[in-house]
């Protein structure tokens, strides 16, 4: 089995740039995932985020999760649970407008730390989108502009904790799915594993590494690249020991952004020169995804194709 792609972003600044860009290209084409080291976010910032996120879970979320487990009788289940996940979560929205000041139970220091972390992640996401543009032969800024809509991108962080699970064979931490959006930046626990992706019909562990950022591609990048890059099924396996922390930040198109394959990539395809993917408004896709998240993505694309006969505003 090939090694999971780990990319040192510092090497973009020297004589290993071409090789590093090739590694990113291969990861996007063949994995849909890669792990970044030396990505520019200071280790001390990440350490503070981790410490405060784990502290907040202990103080504000842990007891609620225990009560939820008890109310649903999850510790005594005898058959596979298919309609919920063994996770405790809350969501922070950064763009187009932040909700951090409104989220209850966060102390002011944690709010400030997360605002700062979000700005750094936003910058990194946009840098990565331009690296993808370079590899795809698209002009710099193409993907950011494709995501922009009228109010800019949607950007937010799902803060998750996966407590020890007594029945990991029957309850998933998070059921298998592809991500609906654009590019996802994950800061995950470096001690408690659980994230897996599907490659060549095998589930492969995404290795926990201290101070790394795991990147994966969402459905919208598959559409814009006309299938050259793919969103990939992934899941979280619950563990019997240790609580796994996960901060997944989703840099997504704006709600009214019109998504469609880049014309140059359609033209570059072989003789057929066909556009395989539909054209749609991102918010319409999200409404469909909300009910079908844990099902295959292909029927979602087909459903959006069926809607294409309707005129799309601003297309």
Swiss-Prot record:
Biological or metabolic pathway of the protein: Alkene biosynthesis; ethylene biosynthesis via S-adenosyl-L-methionine; ethylene from S-adenosyl-L-methionine: step 2/2
Alphabetically ordered keywords of this record: Ethylene biosynthesis, Fruit ripening, Iron, Metal-binding, Oxidoreductase, Vitamin C
Species this protein is from: Solanum lycopersicum (Tomato)
Superkingdom of the organism of origin: Eukaryota
Family, as annotated: Belongs to the iron/ascorbate-dependent oxidoreductase family.
Protein name: 1-aminocyclopropane-1-carboxylate oxidase 1
Catalytic class of the enzyme: oxidoreductase
Reactions listed under catalytic activity: 1-aminocyclopropane-1-carboxylate + L-ascorbate + O2 = ethene + L-dehydroascorbate + hydrogen cyanide + CO2 + 2 H2O
The protein's required cofactors: Fe cation
EC number: 1.14.17.4
PROSITE patterns given in the database record: FE2OG_OXY
Positions of Fe cation binding: 177, 179, 234
GO molecular function, one term: 1-aminocyclopropane-1-carboxylate oxidase activity
Domain Fe2OG dioxygenase positions: 153-253
GO biological process: coumarin biosynthetic process; ethylene biosynthetic process; fruit ripening; response to molecule of fungal origin
Tissues with expression: Predominantly expressed in the petals and the stigma and style.
InterPro entries found in the cross-reference section: DIOX_N, IPNS-like_FE2OG_OXY, IPNS-like_sf, Oxoglu/Fe-dep_dioxygenase_dom, Plant_2OG-oxidoreductases
Keyword Iron: yes
